[in-house]
């Protein structure tokens, strides 16, 4: 599969904001933030990062690929768990420095490595002057031990 080449972003702000060339603005580490929601119900599933190769693979294959900052490599989301993300729509923000993927999740319909549907399964609350986490979605769609051996 040929590797897409992205042109450098224009210095002209109106060129970034209008239709035409998609010229993603990667940060100084070569990454762009990807916000991922369910294409059906709009639930926020995860936030990740992409480098140019992961973004190109996502556009070309229709399957979400991301760049793992901790592992320093590209990964196809769901390759191990079976919870592949089929991309239904890709959007970018006004200055093209963030991507929004609307996806359908296969397999267990779970995105988080903890087995939950969304990585955003906790709320932050203030109790007695201290920020605390509360779990609002404890439903596990799969057992991470069975999938990842962790």
UniProtKB/Swiss-Prot annotation:
Pfam families: PRA-CH (PF01502). InterPro entries: PRA-CH, PRib_AMP_CycHydrolase_dom, PRib_AMP_CycHydrolase_sf. One of its GO terms (molecular function) is magnesium ion binding. Pathway: Amino-acid biosynthesis; L-histidine biosynthesis; L-histidine from 5-phospho-alpha-D-ribose 1-diphosphate: step 3/9. Its EC number is 3.5.4.19. The keyword Cell cycle does not apply. GO terms for biological process: L-histidine biosynthetic process. GO terms for cellular component: cytoplasm. Its main location: cytoplasm. Binds 1 Mg(2+) ion per subunit. Binds 1 zinc ion per subunit. Mg(2+) binds at residues 93, 95, 97. Zn(2+) binds at residues 94, 112, 119. It catalyses: 1-(5-phospho-beta-D-ribosyl)-5'-AMP + H2O = 1-(5-phospho-beta-D-ribosyl)-5-[(5-phospho-beta-D-ribosylamino)methylideneamino]imidazole-4-carboxamide. The keyword Zinc applies. Its cofactor is Mg(2+); Zn(2+). It is found in: Cytoplasm. Keywords: Amino-acid biosynthesis, Cytoplasm, Histidine biosynthesis, Hydrolase, Magnesium, Metal-binding, Zinc. SUPFAM superfamilies: HisI-like. Catalyzes the hydrolysis of the adenine ring of phosphoribosyl-AMP. Homodimer. Belongs to the PRA-CH family. This is Phosphoribosyl-AMP cyclohydrolase. It comes from Rhizobium etli (strain CIAT 652). The lineage of its organism: Bacteria, Pseudomonadati, Pseudomonadota, Alphaproteobacteria, Hyphomicrobiales.
């Amino acid at each position: 599969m040929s590797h897409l080449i992205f042109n450098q972003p224009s210095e002209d702000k109106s060129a970034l904001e209008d239709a035409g060339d998609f010229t993603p603005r990667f940060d100084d580490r070569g990454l762009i933030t990807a916000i991922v929601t369910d294409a059906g119900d709009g639930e926020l599933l995860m936030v990740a990062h992409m480098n140019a190769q992961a973004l190109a693979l996502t556009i070309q294959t229709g399957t979400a690929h991301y760049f793992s900052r901790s592992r320093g490599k590209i990964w196809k989301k769901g390759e191990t768990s079976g919870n592949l993300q089929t991309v239904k729509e890709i959007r970018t923000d006004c200055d093209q420095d963030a991507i929004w993927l609307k996806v359908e999740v296969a397999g267990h319909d779970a995105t988080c490595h903890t087995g939950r549907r969304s990585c955003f399964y906790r709320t932050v609350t203030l109790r007695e002057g201290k920020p605390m986490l509360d779990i609002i979605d404890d439903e596990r769609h799969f057992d991470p031990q069975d999938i990842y051996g962790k």
